[in-house]
C-alpha cells in the first residue's frame, strides 16, 4: 500500500489536521462539553490521542456504510472510469461502494496486524481474502476491523511509539507513523464514500442535524 503516500494530497493532510484538532465532530457530540487542552494534557497518552481521532473516523465510515441501501452497494460513479490511466497511479476504474467498504475493513485488519507484529492479509488493495459480500457481511467485517485496530492502538505508548514497523501496507514505518496512516486512510475513503452517498441523494449520517448511532449488531 505504498502507493497510498502518492495519493496523500495536501487537501487530505489539511483534513486530517482539522479533524485531529477536535474542531470537527459529529453533530451528536457538539453539545457535549469537551475537555479543555489543559485537562487533556493532564491525562492524554499516545494511545488515547489516536483513539480519540479514530473514534470519529469509525463513526463516519461505519455510519456511511449503514446508510447506503444494499441495492446501491454495487454503485460505481459512471465518471469513475478513466482512459489511458497509468497503472502506477492505481486502478482505471473506481471501486463500487461495496469495494470501498471491503477495502477499508481489510486495510484496518492489515494495519492492525503490522502494529501487532503479525502477517497482514494479502491483497487489501483489491478487497483481500475475506469472503464478505452482502451488505450485512460487509458491515460485520467493517465493525470487527475497527475493534481490532482500536485494540492495536491501545498498545502504543511513549516507549514503543517509534519502534520500527515493516510490512506491505504503509511500511517501512514507525508505530506512531503507521497509526497516523490508519487515521488518514479511513478519512480518505470516508471522503470518497460521502460522494457515493450524495450522488444518490443520501445525506451522510455524520452531516445530519441529529446523527444516528451506529449499530452494534447486524
Indicate where each model-derived feature is located.
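Bacterial N-terminal signal peptides that target proteins for export
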Residues: 1-13
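Short, contiguous alpha-helical
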Residues: 47, 51, 55-62, 74-126, ...
Amino acid at each position: 500500500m505504498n502507493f497510498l503516500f502518492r495519493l496523500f494530497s495536501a487537501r487530505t493532510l489539511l483534513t486530517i489536521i482539522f479533524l485531529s484538532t477536535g474542531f470537527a465532530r459529529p453533530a451528536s457530540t457538539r453539545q457535549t462539553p469537551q475537555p479543555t487542552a489543559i485537562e487533556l494534557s493532564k491525562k492524554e497518552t499516545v494511545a488515547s490521542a489516536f483513539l480519540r481521532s479514530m473514534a470519529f473516523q469509525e463513526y463516519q465510515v461505519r455510519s456511511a456504510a449503514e446508510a447506503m441501501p444494499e441495492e446501491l452497494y454495487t454503485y460505481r460513479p459512471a465518471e469513475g472510469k478513466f482512459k489511458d490511466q497509468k497503472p502506477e497511479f492505481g486502478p482505471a476504474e473506481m471501486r463500487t461502494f461495496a469495494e470501498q467498504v471491503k477495502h477499508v475493513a481489510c486495510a484496518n485488519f492489515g494495519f492492525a496486524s503490522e502494529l501487532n507484529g503479525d502477517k497482514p492479509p494479502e491483497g487489501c488493495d483489491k478487497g483481500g481474502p475475506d469472503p464478505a459480500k452482502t451488505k450485512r457481511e460487509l458491515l460485520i467485517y467493517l465493525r470487527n476491523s475497527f475493534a481490532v485496530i482500536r485494540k492495536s492502538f491501545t498498545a502504543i505508548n511513549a516507549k514503543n511509539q517509534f519502534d520500527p514497523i515493516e510490512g506491505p501496507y504503509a511500511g517501512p514505518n514507525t508505530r506512531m507513523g503507521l497509526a497516523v496512516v490508519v487515521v488518514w486512510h479511513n478519512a480518505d475513503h470516508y471522503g470518497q464514500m460521502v460522494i457515493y452517498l450524495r450522488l444518490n441523494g443520501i445525506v451522510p449520517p455524520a452531516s445530519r442535524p441529529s446523527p444516528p448511532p451506529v449499530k452494534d449488531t447486524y
